[in-house]
Swiss-Prot record:
InterPro entries: aa-tRNA-synth_I_CS, Arg-tRNA-ligase, Arg-tRNA-synth_N, Arg-tRNA-synth_N_sf, ArgRS_core, DALR_anticod-bd, Rossmann-like_a/b/a_fold, tRNAsynth_Ia_anticodon-bd. It catalyses: tRNA(Arg) + L-arginine + ATP = L-arginyl-tRNA(Arg) + AMP + diphosphate. A motif ('HIGH' region) lies at residues 131-141. Its main location: cytoplasm. Belongs to the class-I aminoacyl-tRNA synthetase family. This is Arginine--tRNA ligase. It is found in: Cytoplasm. Monomer. GO terms for biological process: arginyl-tRNA aminoacylation. The gene is argS. GO terms for molecular function: arginine-tRNA ligase activity; ATP binding.
Length: 586
């Protein structure tokens, strides 16, 4: 039950009804109409911009149009008052008797309250993490992993058919570097001698067990062999070991994927899908043979002064056309990425979302152009960029990890502060803003720690329900049964404010899904928790506001219904974020 969507329909009907006296009203674009909470709760329950966005098309003053719309809205059931404010904003106050019905709908739906058909079952591919298989995941990967996972969950809750995908970059030069690094650890294990890891290779201790396993399997077989003999073998083994490590890291963070897609598969089994994709683009005129001009200012990636295959990315708004084939005949990363997204299209995805690190921001425009070109405009690519994470402890930057060699691993952070703290805090700031993650602060049990504050609200709700059951054994346990409680007994301003806050959950879900902004869920849950804790604290000072009233069963039932509603929305929202809705704080 989306109150805002329901009344948006009423507003559109009111505008359409004006067609009798204003013929132009029948041809208006009503999609611009928004119904939202007023900025000041004292102004009512709902506000709409209808007159402000439609007046120009009707050649009317916004306030004059607002008066006409308001007169129609005043006749809508459950509307107690309609006010026109300022230049033409319309504020609606609903009957007090309307809100118990909203709470009852919430209680009947439980944690499914807010589930939407916004997506209409549209297939969406969400690709995230896609860390190179060259080592353990670090704290920088963590943000994109949590963001992508929460976004996928949010989209699924909003009615999209979501596929979660991880792209394994196992065909580039970095996996050869991995193989050479593993070989040195193999020599170390096979000979018992300490090997110095030169610059340009991976120095982390995480490759030590890989080398030991290789030594156990191959003994001294490859100690004197040329690289050409051992490189493919060591590369395959090391990639497998790294992906197993990455999967374990992801599992610790509560993340799983539907698809792991290998870059190497694009040119495997005798079929060069990268080359085929380039030829397809050549036939449509999107790829041509030409020379790039010398770079101006910052160097252009992959620039070489030679005749080469170029993608016409400038035709799609990019700064320069982009190379697809290197001078040694191998493909650029860009060429492989085009073929990969073509594969997504061939698998039926017309909507793709990629989650990248902010350092890939310059890659967005060309990749979107390529997707448009390779799918003949039938598919869209949206890219969400995640900014850097600064890892702190009591305000001081955390030193690098010995295990990783040059960074702090995701696993170290999760092991220290827990999955829930990591996930919630990674989402408690918009993804395009730099995040300071303080290991000391995220485990504080205080109001200043958002994850504790929200989880504690759910635990407090469950504690109230347990206490009520202990005092009155005949009370129902199911929240759905409380939908039949005398909810009109909820008359306190704080109670009604909390009901109205909960009523905003379906709208919040659709807004966050449409904007691809799961941080909105975290912010909203914090607001719900704040209001719930506030109402509980009022009951400490004013006994008549407590949730359990000894001599008034009906009022107790109504307030316990509200507690069930709070718990359901908190559990639903935390579930979307991948955070546990705990019943007790430890």
């Amino acid at each position: 039950m989306n109150v805002y969507a329901i009344f948006a329909d009423h507003v559109r009907e009111a505008v359409a009804a004006l067609a009798g006296e204003l013929p132009e009203a029948g041809a208006l674009d009503l999609s611009r109409i928004v119904v939202e909470p007023p900025r000041d709760a004292a102004h009512g329950d709902l506000a709409t911009n209808a007159a402000m966005v439609l007046a120009k098309d009707l050649k009317m003053k916004p306030r004059d149009l607002a008066e006409k719309i308001a007169a129609r809205l005043a006749q809508v059931p459950n509307v107690a008052k309609v006010d026109v404010a300022g230049p033409g904003f319309i504020n609606l106050t609903l009957d007090a008797g309307y809100w118990p019905g909203v709470l009852a709908a919430l209680l009947r739906a439980g944690t499914d309250f807010g589930r939407s058909d916004l997506g209409g079952g549209e297939a969406v591919n969400v690709e995230y993490v896609s860390a190179n298989p060259t080592g353990p995941m670090h704290v920088g990967h963590c943000r994109g992993a949590v963001f992508g996972d929460a976004l996928a969950s949010l989209l699924a809750f909003a009615g999209f058919k979501v596929t979660r995908e991880y792209y394994i970059n196992d065909a580039g030069a970095q996996v050869d570097v991995l193989a050479r690094s593993a070989y040195l650890r193999y020599r170390e294990a096979a000979t018992g001698e300490t090997v110095e890891i030169p610059d340009g290779l991976y120095p982390g201790d995480y490759l030590v067990p890989v080398g030991k396993t290789l030594a156990e399997v191959h003994g001294s077989e490859y100690l004197e062999s040329p690289e050409s003999e051992w490189l493919p073998i060591f590369r395959t083994f090391a990639i497998g070991a790294m992906m197993e490590m990455i999967r374990d890291d992801l599992q610790a963070l509560g993340i799983s994927f539907d698809v792991f897609f290998s870059e190497r598969s694009l040119t495997a089994a005798g079929i060069d899908r990268v080359g085929l994709t380039i030829e397809q683009l050549r036939r449509t005129g999107e790829v041509y043979e030409g020379r790039l001009p010398p770079p101006k200012g910052a160097p252009i990636e992959d620039w070489e002064d030679r005749e080469q295959s170029l993608f016409r990315s400038t035709a799609h708004g990019d700064d320069v056309d982009r190379p697809l084939v290197k001078s040694d005949g191998s493909y650029t990363y860009f060429a492989g990425d085009i073929a990969y997204h073509k594969d997504k299209f061939d698998r039926g995805f017309r909507r793709m979302i990629d989650v990248w690190g902010a350092d890939h921001g310059g890659y967005v425009k060309r990749m979107q152009a390529a997707v448009k070109a390779v799918t003949a405009g039938q598919a869209t690519l949206d890219v969400e960029l995640c900014q850097l994470v600064r890892l702190l402890r009591n305000g001081e930057q955390v030193r690098m990890s010995k295990r990783a060699g040059s960074f702090v691993t995701l696993r170290e952070v999760v092991d220290e502060v827990g999955r829930d703290a990591v996930r919630f805090m990674m989402l408690f700031r918009k993804n395009d803003a730099t995040l300071d993650f303080d290991l000391a602060k995220v485990i504080e049990q205080s109001r200043e720690n958002p994850v504790f504050y929200v989880q504690y609200a759910h635990a407090r709700a469950q504690s109230i329900l347990r206490n009520a059951k202990e005092q009155h054994a005949d009370l129902p346990e199911s929240g759905a049964i409380y939908a039949h409680a005398p909810l009109d007994r909820l008359t306190d301003e704080g109670e009604l404010g909390l009901v109205k806050r909960l009523a905003g959950w379906p709208r919040l879900v659709e807004q966050a899904a449409h904007a691809r902004e799961p941080h909105r869920v975290a912010f909203y849950l914090h607001e719900v928790a704040s209001e719930f804790h506030g109402q509980w604290n009022r009951g400490k000072d004013l006994p008549h506001l407590r949730f359990i009233i000894e001599n008034d069963r009906e009022l107790t039932m109504a307030r316990l219904a509200l507690v069930h509603g709070v718990a359901a929305v908190l559990a639903s929202g935390l579930g979307l974020l991948g955070v546990e809705a705990v019943d007790e704080m430890k």
